[in-house]
Design a protein with these regions (language model features):
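Secondary-structure boundary elements
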Residues: 78-82, 88, 100-168, 176, ...
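Short secondary-structure junctions
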Residues: 32-34, 184-187
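Intrinsically disordered, low-complexity N-terminal segments that are enriched in acidic
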Residues: 1-87, 91
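Catalytic nucleophile-His microenvironment captured as a short glycine-rich beta-strand/loop
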Residues: 10, 178-181
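A charged helix-plus-loop insertion that forms the helical arch/lid used to bind
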Residues: 97
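Functionally critical, mid-to-C-terminal surface segments that flank or help form catalytic/ligand
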Residues: 171-178, 188
């Protein structure tokens, strides 16, 4: 088990019109993540609405802030338990057998345009042994073909941008690997 302590403090100055917020700062409720303690402080007398996504356990807090200062403080102690498998024994699951809850992770997204990487993914990795070794080959390929360079991307940088520019930061490496996996129908 791994224990993590989170402490978040956000400070805002709200104009005379007030403001609506949606925060994603709460620790998620999942089978492998137990929240042993948590505390939320709002400097304004606000009754927030907290929604838990039934699929992934992520929690969102919505609130309407009044004019003036707003301080949001959240702290939590979270205990994580992970399932470990021997990577060599992790099979690749055909699309027809994928659990419904992971189907969304094979589709293209704003940052992971897997539909634009189909030809590259299939020509480079399509003939490889399916399963962990194929995912590991994708990781190695990205590591060989993309250079880590601080400040080389921004919030609009996508997997295709990273592939073209061949530079990026951690997030960009992840987006390119995710897009290549999705292009091969490997949920990521």
């Amino acid at each position: 088990m791994i224990r993590i302590q989170l402490n978040i403090e956000l400070n805002y100055e709200i104009d005379q019109f007030g403001a609506d917020f949606v925060f994603n700062i709460h620790a998620a409720h999942t089978a492998s993540q137990q929240i042993s303690s948590e505390n939320l402080f709002l400097s304004q007398a606000i009754d927030p609405q907290i929604y838990t996504d039934p699929v992934n356990g992520n929690r969102y807090m919505r609130l309407r802030a009044w004019p003036g200062p707003l301080k949001v403080q959240y702290s939590a102690t979270v205990d994580l338990t992970h399932h470990f498998s021997n990577p060599a024994q992790v099979p690749e699951v055909p699309v027809r057998n994928l659990p419904p809850e992971v189907m969304g992770y094979i589709y293209p997204s704003r940052y992971c345009q897997s539909d634009r990487l189909l030809k590259l993914a299939n020509s480079t990795f399509g003939g490889q042994w399916q399963g962990y070794s194929r995912v590991e080959a994708i990781r190695e390929w990205v590591q060989r073909h993309v250079t880590f360079t601080s400040n080389s991307s921004n919030t609009n940088t996508s997997a295709v941008d990273t592939l073209i520019e061949r530079v990026g930061i951690c997030r960009d490496f992840a987006h390119l690997m995710i897009a290549l996996c999705r292009a091969l129908n490997i949920p990521a």
